[in-house]
C-alpha cells in the first residue's frame, strides 16, 4: 500500500496514571469528532465493563476510529487505542503501544507526574513512539501548569514546552489536542513487504460471532471472504466481516495498511487467535511473523474453587473464555482435601486477582471460594534440581530442601517530600533494602528492593494510607534470593488443612502462627466437643488454642441431692464428648480461608 493513502492516518493511545482523566479526555475526543451524538454520550464510553465503571479504572484495551476535519482542511483518520493505567495491567499498555506511532501523556495539573505514567512513558519511548504531553484538569483551583511542565521534564525527561493545557471535563482546548495529534504524531510507515501482516492486539469471545480480534494491519489488506492464516498455529480461517469501532461496531469492505479494526472469522476455539500473534493470507503468507509481545509471567497465585462442586465444568469454561480476553491469566486444575476440585490460577497482582474473581462471579454467575494468594518460590532440592513452587502445600519434605528462594522486586515510589519518613519506615517494616533517593522538583523518587510476598498482600493500600493517597508505585521483578523460610501448617483436631498453609520468614513464623490460631478461634463455630487449633512448623507445634465445647447443663434436673449423683452425670457427659470428638468433623467456614489475607491488616 502506498504511503499516500497512509498519510492521513494517525494511530495513538493515551498514557496516564489512574484517575488523571484519561477516559474523560477520550470521551471529549469522541464527541468532538462526532463519533457519538450528544444524547448517546455517557461518562467513560470506552470503559464498557461494569467493573471498570464502578472502580473508575480501565482494565481492557479498547479501540475507536474517528474522522477528524483539521484546521488545514484535510480529513484525518484517528485510531485511538485506550490503555489501562494501573500497575497490574502494564502488559495491556505495551500491547496497545505496539500498534501505535504516538501517545498522549496525560498529567493531572493538580497532582503532577505519578509513577505509573513514568513506567508507561518509558515503554512508549523504548518503542520509538512520539510522546505528546497533555496537562489536564486546568479548571481545578489547585492546578499548577508550570509545576506540571517542570515535573514532566525533571521526572520523565521529555520536552514539555509545547505541552497542551486542557480541561477534559469542560472541553476547554480539546481541539488543540486533536491538532497536536495530527501535526506531531507521524503517519504509519510502509513496510518493505506487500504481503499481509496484521498484529492481534486483543481478542474476546462473542456468543454469536465466535472470537472477535482487534488487529492493527501493518501491511497489505484484509477483506471479507479472505482466507487468513494464524502464523503461530498455522490454522486457516475464512473472514466473515471486518470493520472498525466508531465506538459502535461498523462493518467496512476492507481494512488497509495502517488501520486498526476488528476481524471475525467464525473461530469457535477460544485459543484460535492468540493475542500478539500475526495474521497473514493463507494463499500468499508473509515470510516471518511480526515481533509480538513479551509473555507476561504471573507473579501471584491463588486457588479458585466453586462453592458447589457441580459448577466445576462451568468454571473451566468461564476461565477459558476469560483467558482469551486476558492473556496474562494462567490456570491449571487443582484438588484440595478441604475444598474439593478447583483451579490454581496465576495473576499479575492483587487488583488483577480481585477483578478476575469479580468478573467470574458476575459475568458467569459463579459462587467462588479463593484461597490466600502466594507468590512463586524457587526451591533448590538436595539432589541439585530447582523447582518453582506456587502452592505452599507442594513444598517437598524439609530433609529434601537445600534452600528456598523468594522473588525480589524493585519498587519505585514517587511521593511528595513530606511523606518520605513514613514511606521509608513502611519499606523497612516490609524487609526492604534501599537502593536510592532522587529529588525531582517537589517530588521524591524512592527506590527499594522488597520481597514480593510482602508487597503482594497489602503494601499498595498501606502506601496510600501513610502518604494520604499521594504516593504512587511501580514495580518490576528483579531476581530470586535465598532466605530462612519455613512452612506454617494449620492443624484442626490433628488434621492438616492444606488450604491454610503459608510460607513465611522464620523470624515471623511464631507471630504469624499465633495470629492465625487466634483468628481461627474466632471464626470456627463452637461444636459439641473441644476443637484444638494448632500451628506447626514441620513436627514442632508453635501455637495452640482451643474452641471450647458447648455444654448442656446436665445438672439442671438435680434439685439438691447427693454430690455423687451429680458427679456420675458429669462423667457420663464427659465420656459422650470424648466419643463424639473421635468421630466428629469440623466444618471450616469460607471466612477462615480468607483470614490468612487479613492477618496483616490489624
From Swiss-Prot:
Q: Entry's InterPro entries?
A: EF-4, EFG_III/V, EFG_V-like, EFTu-like_2, G_TR_CS, LepA_C_sf, LepA_CTD, LepA_IV
Primary location: membrane
- Which reactions fall under this protein's catalytic activity? GTP + H2O = GDP + phosphate + H(+)
Q: How does it sit in the membrane?
A: Peripheral membrane protein
Q: Which GO terms describe its biological process?
A: positive regulation of translation
Where do the annotations place GTP binding?
Answer: 19-24, 136-139
GO CC terms of this entry: plasma membrane
EC number(s): the record gives 3.6.5.n1
The record places domain tr-type G at 7-189
Annotated Gene3D superfamilies: 3.30.70.240, Elongation factor 4, C-terminal domain (3.30.70.2570), Elongation Factor G (Translational Gtpase), domain 3 (3.30.70.870), P-loop containing nucleotide triphosphate hydrolases (3.40.50.300), Translation factors (2.40.30.10)
Taken from the record, one Pfam family name reads EFG_C
Q: Where in the cell is it found?
A: Cell inner membrane
Q: Which UniProt keywords apply?
A: Cell inner membrane, Cell membrane, GTP-binding, Hydrolase, Membrane, Nucleotide-binding, Protein biosynthesis
**PANTHER family, sorted:** TRANSLATION FACTOR GUF1 HOMOLOG, CHLOROPLASTIC (PTHR43512:SF4), TRANSLATION FACTOR GUF1-RELATED (PTHR43512)
Say what the protein does.
Required for accurate and efficient protein synthesis under certain stress conditions. May act as a fidelity factor of the translation reaction, by catalyzing a one-codon backward translocation of tRNAs on improperly translocated ribosomes. Back-translocation proceeds from a post-translocation (POST) complex to a pre-translocation (PRE) complex, thus giving elongation factor G a second chance to translocate the tRNAs correctly. Binds to ribosomes in a GTP-dependent manner.
Concerning its family, UniProt says: Belongs to the TRAFAC class translation factor GTPase superfamily. Classic translation factor GTPase family. LepA subfamily.
Q: Which NCBIfam families match?
A: lepA, small_GTP
Could you identify this protein by its name? Elongation factor 4
Q: Which organism is it from?
A: Stenotrophomonas maltophilia (strain R551-3)
